[in-house]
Structure formats: C-alpha cells, structure tokens
Amino acid sequence: MSKFFVNVAPINNSNSSSSHTTTSSNTQRHQQHQQHYGGSGTTGHTMVARRLNYDLHGGTTSINNNNNIVIKNESVDLDYDHVLSSSDSNSNGGVAAHLRDHVYISLDKGHNTGAVATAAAAATAGHTQQQLQQQHHHQNQQQRKATGKSNDITNYYKVKRRPHAVSDEIHPKKQAKQSAHHQTVYQKHTASSAPQQLRHSHHQLRHDADAELDEDVVERVAKPASHHPFSLSTPQQQLAASVASSSSSGDRNRADTSLGILTKKFVDLLQESPDGVVDLNEASNRLHVQKRRIYDITNVLEGINILEKKSKNNIQWRCGQSMVSQERSRHIEADSLRLEQQENELNKAIDLMRENLAEISQEVENSGGMAYVTQNDLLNVDLFKDQIVIVIKAPPEAKLVLPNTKLPREIYVKAENSGEINVFLCHDTSPENSPIAPGAGYVGAPGAGCVRTATSTRLHPLTNQRLNDPLFNNIDAMSTKGLFQTPYRSARNLSKSIEEAAKQSQPEYNNICDIAMGQHHNLNQQQQQQQQQLLQQPEEDDVDVELNQLVPTLTNPVVRTHQFQQHQQPSIQELFSSLTESSPPTPTKRRREAAAAAIAAGSSTTATTTLNSHNNRNHSNHSNHSNHSSSNNSKSQPPTIGYGSSQRRSDVPMYNCAMEGATTTSATADTTAATSRSAAASSLQMQFAAVAESNNGSSSGGGGGGGGYGSIAGAGANADPHQPYSHDRNSLPPGVADCDANSNSSSVTLQGLDALFNDIGSDYFSNDIAFVSINPPDDNDYPYALNANEGIDRLFDFGSDAYGP
C-alpha cells in the first residue's frame, strides 16, 4: 500500500473554490492542532498523515504551468470518520477489534470540499482561524446528518498504523532510485504574524514533523547537507541524515549474504562441532542471518544425503564425527599421488616420442627423403625370428583391421580410394634355413648330388637327413595319416572310385583273356624276342623311373624285375597286374582247382596273376619245375606252380593295383626231355605286360643258360624294352619282384600268385565271377559330398611302417 495519499475529494477547478478550499484547509489544520495540543479532549482522535501536494512554484493555483513544480511535504490532521459525534469520549466505539489499528479516510461524494483538502504551510490569523473552525465544525455536523450510518466500508481508505519504528537500513538500489526520482523539500513552518499563544503549538508541530521524518523510510534520502536547498535546523534532522548516509555507505554487498557463502560458513560450523551436531538457532545467531536462510541450506544438504535431522532444531552429518574418514582420506591422497606419478611418466614418454620423431624427421631430411628398410633389416629383428614376415605396401589412407585380437590369424587391409595394395613375403634365403638343400639325394644312387625335394624326403624318411625347416616339420604326420581309420566320407569316395574303375576295365580285361587263350602260340615268339632284347641292355638305377614306379595310379600297376639267378632254366612266368580280391572265396578256389588240373594234364602253361593288392596274407607253395635237356634237342616239361604264402590286408579293398608280398620259387628236377610251351597275355591298350621265355635244357647239378623276368612298367604299354638285366651268378634269387607303392628301391618280394594254366577253355572267365560289384554306402547313412581327391593317401598308404631297412 502506498505510503503517500492523494486527493480523495474532487477538486474544483475554479479559482474561488480552490482558494476557499486552501484557506479552510489551513484553518482546519490549525484548529485541530490547537485542539490536540491545547488540552481540548472533546474532539476525537486525530492522525497526522503525510501527503505530497504538487503546487506551482509561483504560488498561484490558476496558472497551468507544470514546468515549475515543487514537492511540498505537509502534515495534515485527519479525523476519523466515525458514526459517533465529536463529543463522544470513546472514539473507537463502533469499530471492530481487528480494524482498530487502521485509520479510515472517508470519501465525501456529495460535497465539493472533503474532510481532507490541500494544506498550505502559512498560518493565518487567530480570528480567521476561529471563524473557519466554527464553519468547519458546522459543515461536519451537516455531513454526518446527511450521511448518517449509510456510509459503506468501501468508501474508506485503509491506512496501516506503524506501531514500531522502521529500521534504519535502506537497500542501496532502492535508495538510489528514490534519490533519482524524488527530491524532498523541507519547508520550515514559521508564523510571522502569529500571536504569542500559538508559538508553542507551532513548535510542537515542527517536532512532530521531525519525528515523522525519522520514521518514514521514503523521506530519508542519503544526501549530504549541502545538496539540500535548505539547512537542517534541528539536531535530530542532522543525526538522521548522518545515520542514513553512513548506513548507505556501509551496507553489505549481496554476495556477502548469498547461499553459497552461507553454506561454506555453515559447513565450517559443522566441522568445528565436536560431534558433528549443530543447533540451527545458534547457527542463525552466529551467521547473523534469518533462520529461514539456514533452512534453505539444510534442506538441500538433506536432499543429497549429507545431513540428517537429529532433533527439531539440530542437524548432524551422516558420515559421523568427521565429514571424511581418515582411511578414505588416505586412499584419496594415495590415489592422487599415484595419478600424479602416472601423469609425469606419460609426460616424459610423450617428450621422448617427440624427440625420437624429430630425430627421425631430421634423418629423413638429411638422407634426401629416402626412408626404406631392407629384407635383412627385417629378418634381423629379434621379434621376427622364426616367424613368417609379410610386408604390406598400401596407400597412406589405407585401413588395417584385425578382426580377432586374441587369435591374430587374419587381417583386412582396405584402401579408401581403391588404391593399389602390394603384399610381399619376406623369407630367409640363408642355406641353413632354405627348404631346398643341395647334396641330399638317394643313398647309393648316382644322382646323390641332386636336389632334395619334399617327395623324396617323404618316400625316404630313414635314409635321408631331415630338413631343418618349420614348413616341413610335420611331413611325417602328413604322410602317415592313411594309417588311421578312414572317415566315412573317404570310404564312400573310395568305394565309388573302385566301382567306376571296375565298370570301365571289365570289358577290356575279358577281351585280354580271350586274346591270351586264342593266340598264346603267337605271343610266345614275340615275348622271346623281347626277352632277348632286354637281356642285352645294361642295368641302370634311374631315380625318375623308380619314382614313376613307386607312384602309380588306380589303373597303373607297376612290376619291377630282378635277375634270374639260374641260367638255362626252362621256367616261364607270366605276370599280370590284377584286381583286389574283394570277391568271395569261391572264384579263387575255382581258379586254383583249374590250375591244378591243367598242371596234372600236362597242358601248356599260361601265366596269370591273382588280384591280391593291399591284402596282407601270404600264400606260399612250392612247385617243382623239371627241365630236362639233351645234347641234341631240348624239351621243356610243364612246370608245377603252387600258391605261395602271402600277407593279406583287409582294411582297404582295392582292385587293379600293385601286387605285394608274394614269392614263387622254382626247382629243377631230373626228368626226361619235355617240351615246354609257354603262353603269356600282353596288355592291349591296358596296364599289363608279360615276358615269356621258352628254353629247352636239362641240368642235374644246376647249370645252363640264363633267363629272367622282364620289367613291366607303364600304363597301357607293352614290356619296357629298356629295362636292364644282368647275368651275374651271385645276384638275388629268382622270382623276386616288387610293385608296392611304398617301396624305397630295396628288394621286396613280388605280391600275387603266379599260375601256369594249360589247355584252359575259353569259357573259364565267362563262368567265373572275375569282378564283384562293390555297392557304395547309402546316401542316408553318409550324407557327404563326393570328392575325387579323397582317399588317395589311404589308397597308396604312404606310411612310414611300409619302408624296409
């Protein structure tokens, strides 16, 4: 509510009305003062209200010049507008108890001049005041009679009384604002023509005005005395002005009373407390702030679980006697020290890296911009020892991604602009680490100084020195994997391959048998000529030929012959590479019975070989061949051929492969001259070859001409005419041959059975079951895809156990 009052009665603009109102107002004020201070108690209580009147500086109210406006501070005596008359002793009668501390100023709507009017500072003469007082009293009585009790409460303005003096402190901003917009002019009330009886009342009026000046906040503007257009006449005014100026200059700043500073001070009080408990009343007194400010701090600290309320006005830290425990403080200090040390180490490392980078840059500049490393530089690094080093040359913007850091087996290099990426293998070419070393050939071979390869190392693991290279360390494990159980997929693939080869080879094999039965006489002469040509050639041990013999294919049987020791022996053996004996034993028994019958009947012999590859059972029989020779003519008796003991292996059935582990022997017997007829079937566009020799001779103690086996090596070709033979008497025993794929150029026994057949009908092979189909496993049992390369290691069995000493 405003501290100033404006005119509540409508002001008449006419000069006469204004002049009359001013005169009556001055008279009324003087009369009221005289009644109040002069001991007249018949009138009601009055209140001095301060109002600002804007009068023109010229003193004339008729001039409408607003440029010269002087603010006048006047004291106006106001009467309570009560229903009771002025003669009533109880002026508060009829006012409610809760409204007694207020002053109500009535608004007279029907009269031109109200109870409150503009007041002037000049005092009039005594007789004039007497008349005006009587006139004003008469007007008040008429007003009360007219209005009566009809005045509504809304017609009053409420003014709050001030039971206590206002504090001397004024905010600097408010004080500056008031000093800028208001200029209070103090005007002394002097009575030049007043009589002696009014001097005391005017002195009391000035004293009351000075008291009101001390109580009112708005009137105390911090200005020096020199700025006022008037001088302060009383000591009270000078004291008030000095207090106002000192309070304004020494006022505290807002930052001093902020919550942040108060919170710090409050925390200091908590730390000073021995048990961490602080009384809020004591804190408010020590900090010189209101208690609600302390509550603002404690509410926030309670919200973040730092404080807890112990009682009504006592709060305590939640962490106990100290805000931070000693152990936690030690941990914090240790962590801070450790982090500082790490920071120092990192700073040193960064400085070192910068120095190294500067040195490298300087070296590059000194070398003319050429920065490169050689292969030896990379291989000499200890980190890359015994490792495969790969050098990648990529554009600068290329990205290298390592998918799995735990198993760094793969890396991805990608160029953003599709630049060229070059990858180089940095390998060690020193002699001790080279995978190809000179001077390591076959033992005892002429080419001992040839290059040693991985194949020769695998075929000769016992006679050759092992390579010192990490790439060939597991060569034995690779070569012996055929010794383990064949997986389902390999077994199925092997069965499929055998079946397909059997279907392709069966018609041609039957055709060979028919030709051998019908044209065996013509073949005898051709085989004799081939045998003579082979005997004339020297024996050689060629490594390439040996490797070709040791690495056959599915349809390429290899037979290697050796020297036949006994000369002039009329033994004829016909060699055939045969299929695996996977058929039931019934056809085998039939062939054996037919061979025995043919030998007993003395028919011409026919050489054949029984399919016995990869079956490790040996059958050995001894048959005696009797050769009788005379001086005039020589006849050959049909030799007797028995089945020898052979080792059979039933793990992998095969057909049309090399023969192993069979021996045939021949002995001489003193019999009469007989004619020996031999027939051999040679391969026509197949992998079979035969050598036959027919000689007539007789010996009693072992002597005569020489004969031997011919070497059969080649796919779909006849007997090799270049295979060497020798006639040394101290050579190996007769009938020794090898065709195993695992052979290491040493003499092993010939696998298979050599049989001599005489007068066997052409319907023998048609009645006998030469081939038995191999049914592959069902696809439901082995749902795997076929692979033509699987089973090869198992088929040829490159195992280390097959090598002989």
UniProtKB/Swiss-Prot annotation:
It is found in: Nucleus. Keywords: Activator, Developmental protein, DNA-binding, Nucleus, Phosphoprotein, Transcription, Transcription regulation, Ubl conjugation. A motif (PIP-box K+4 motif) lies at residues 147-161. InterPro entries: E2F, E2F-DP_heterodim, E2F_CC-MB, E2F_WHTH_DNA-bd_dom, WH-like_DNA-bd_sf, WH_DNA-bd_sf. Its main location: nucleus. Signal peptide: none annotated. Residues 9-45, 119-208, 224-255, 578-650, 714-743 are annotated as: Disordered. GO terms for molecular function: DNA binding; DNA-binding transcription activator activity, RNA polymerase II-specific; DNA-binding transcription factor activity; DNA-binding transcription factor binding; DNA-binding transcription repressor activity, RNA polymerase II-specific; protein dimerization activity; RNA polymerase II cis-regulatory region sequence-specific DNA binding; RNA polymerase II transcription regulatory region sequence-specific DNA binding. Residues 144-154, 181-195, 637-647 have a biased composition (Polar residues). Gene3D superfamilies: 6.10.250.540, Winged helix-like DNA-binding domain superfamily/Winged helix DNA-binding domain. GO terms for cellular component: nucleoplasm; nucleus; Rb-E2F complex; RNA polymerase II transcription regulator complex. The modification Phosphoserine is found at residue 434. It holds the Pfam family E2F_TDP. CDD domains: E2F_DD. Residues 318-411 are annotated as: Dimerization. It comes from the Eukaryota. Ubiquitinated by the DCX(DTL) complex, also named CRL4(CDT2) complex, leading to its degradation during S phase. Ubiquitination by the DCX(DTL) complex is essential for cell cycle control and is PCNA-dependent: interacts with PCNA via its PIP-box, while the presence of the containing the 'K+4' motif in the PIP box, recruit the DCX(DTL) complex, leading to its degradation. PANTHER family: TRANSCRIPTION FACTOR E2F, TRANSCRIPTION FACTOR E2F2-RELATED. Belongs to the E2F/DP family. Transcriptional activator that binds to E2f sites. Required for wild-type growth in mitotic and polytene tissues, Contributes to the expression of replication genes at the G1-S transition and Cyclin E. Activates cell proliferation in wing imaginal disk, which requires expression of vg. This is Transcription factor E2f1. It comes from Drosophila melanogaster (Fruit fly). The gene is E2f1.
